[in-house]
């Protein structure tokens, strides 16, 4: 997105770009799901270079596959829990109500279900981490932050 020279500081801006590119409602919903994941999973490295679009040969724009999705909350950092992109003007302490209001303003349907699905995935982090053999030290550290 940086090559387009649009100033994007908020998730609202990201959705404006999606509308300008004529993304489908399904893809805008997927963008919303990714935003919810970033908020709930403490992926605060959610800057604009971590969101991309691809143009298909027929000239239609689509969201790219998700990438650079990592746990990035460091309790020892000055920037602990500060998101790069804001949600309703907030970089931290983003609530479920904020996510629902955002969805309403962006005409995203089934926001409550999306939030619940993502919450379930995040709350089951330990089982996913154990399957891919993440060290127990890191599992405990990440779980502590996710459960705060």
Predicted features by range, described:
Residues 1-48, 52-148:
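Anionic ligand-binding catalytic core segments
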């Amino acid at each position: 997105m940086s090559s387009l020279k649009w100033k994007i500081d908020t998730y609202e801006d990201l959705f404006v770009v999606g509308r300008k590119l004529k993304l489908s409602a399904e893809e805008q919903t997927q963008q919303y799901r990714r935003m919810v994941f970033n908020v709930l999973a403490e992926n605060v490295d959610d800057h604009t270079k971590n969101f991309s679009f691809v143009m298909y040969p027929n000239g239609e724009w689509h969201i790219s596959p998700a990438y650079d999705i990592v746990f990035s909350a460091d309790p020892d950092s000055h920037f602990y829990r500060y998101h790069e992109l804001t949600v309703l003007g907030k970089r931290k302490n983003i609530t479920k109500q904020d996510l629902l209001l955002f969805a309403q303003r962006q005409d995203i349907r089934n926001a409550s279900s999306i939030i619940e699905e993502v919450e379930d995935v995040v709350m089951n982090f330990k089982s996913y981490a154990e399957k891919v053999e993440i060290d127990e030290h890191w599992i405990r550290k990440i779980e502590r932050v996710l459960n705060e």
